[in-house]
């Protein structure tokens, strides 16, 4: 049985989170491809949909193809290399997913105002986006709160967490925000922390509101 040091185990856990974020991003792209095959909104020449489709679709985005080779290599290095992977690799991947988070948020909001967008397209994007949102914000809160700090909860506190705090508590708190219908489990200590918690809460309330409206609309059409 392979035994890992605490720092090596922490890197493996973080790489697992980033890999799951990549898979959720790929799921969003698959749903867009499915809509294109069904001749829905993708082929109706709306610039915002086409731009997002090009950003997400594997055939149009070389970074997605590159990930097919890079991610397995990172896993092999993380599992079998004695040295730790450079921190910049994780931060670079995390920054890409933060960009993806913003693109997805804008896309979901714009999509609701486009009459050609089918209800399954919007609802499917929301379903794929919510777990991505939870994990991406959990990673961001953990990274900022623990970066260069002697102990966690110097920038952001987690109301329901118990000592000792670890990365899981940030993902758990992010998920609870969705389960509790937008009630934030984070509290900012510094101005940066307060700003992040505010942005997180506003984005979450927006996504939950869109999901509720779209789900209600689908139920009305079924009745």
Go through the PLM ranges and name each one.
Residues 146-190:
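Membrane-proximal soluble regions of multi-pass membrane proteins
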């Amino acid at each position: 049985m392979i035994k890992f040091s605490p720092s090596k185990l922490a890197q493996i856990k973080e790489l697992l989170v980033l890999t799951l974020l990549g898979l959720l991003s790929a799921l969003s792209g698959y749903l867009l491809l499915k809509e294109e095959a069904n001749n829905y909104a993708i082929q109706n020449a709306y610039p915002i949909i086409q731009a997002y489709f090009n950003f997400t679709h594997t055939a149009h985005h070389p970074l997605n193809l590159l990930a097919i080779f890079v991610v397995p290599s990172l896993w092999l290095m993380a599992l079998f290399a004695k040295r730790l992977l450079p921190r910049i690799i994780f931060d670079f991947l995390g920054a890409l997913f933060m960009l993806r988070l913003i693109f997805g948020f804008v896309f979901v909001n714009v999509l609701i105002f486009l009459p050609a967008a089918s209800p399954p397209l919007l609802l499917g994007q929301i379903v794929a986006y919510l777990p991505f949102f939870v994990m991406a914000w959990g990673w961001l809160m953990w990274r900022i709160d623990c970066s260069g700090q002697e102990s966690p909860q110097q920038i952001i506190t987690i109301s329901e967490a118990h000592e000792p705090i670890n990365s899981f508590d940030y993902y758990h708190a992010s998920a609870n925000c969705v389960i509790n219908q937008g009630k934030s489990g984070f509290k900012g200590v510094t101005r940066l922390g307060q700003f992040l918690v505010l942005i997180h809460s506003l984005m979450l309330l927006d996504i939950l509101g869109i999901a509720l409206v779209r789900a209600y609309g689908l139920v009305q059409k079924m009745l």
